[in-house]
Amino acid sequence: MDLKQGSHIHLMGICGTAMASLAGLLKDRGFKVSGSDANPYPPMSTQIESLGIEIKKGYAAENLHPKPDFVIVGNVISRGNAEAIELEKLEIPFTSLPKAMGEYIIANHECINISGTHGKTTTTSLMSWLLDQL
């Protein structure tokens, strides 16, 4: 979906590490960003709020009012979730975190992706240090 600066993007599950980072990147690119999470807590909640991004506690149909232009759905959201049901009812365009990252953040850039079950933070720290040494 082609989104213009100023478009409203809502992130369901915004306090996850990757989702919070994506929220900040989207805000930096000129989008209006909001989000919801079951239990927002520091450090992610304070990081997000320091960027001027509103976090709605809990998942509820009213979190999608006023209606955002686009929604990014985190992996934590299940089909029976009240907010997910409202998302389908309102027919708001949506995507997943990985697809949003690919389309709105890393498109047309070289990228190093670090994934897996264990060791991502350590590997990312080491990779950052190595690249900084170049």
Q: For each of these PLM feature ranges, what is it?
A:
Residues 37, 59, 75-77:
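Short glycine-rich, polar/acidic loop-and-turn segments at beta strand-coil junctions
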Residues 1-40, 49-53, 67, 71, ...:
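ATP-dependent carboxylate-amine ligase
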Residues 10, 59, 118-119:
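Histidine-centered active-site/metal-ligand motif
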Residues 38-39, 60, 99-100:
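Short, ordered loop/turn segments at secondary-structure junctions
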Residues 44:
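Phosphate-/polyanion-interacting regions in eukaryotic proteins
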Residues 4, 25, 49, 63-66, ...:
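Phosphate-binding loop of NTP-binding sites
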Residues 55-59, 95:
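Short acidic-hydrophobic, aromatic-tinged amphipathic segments that line or gate anion-handling sites
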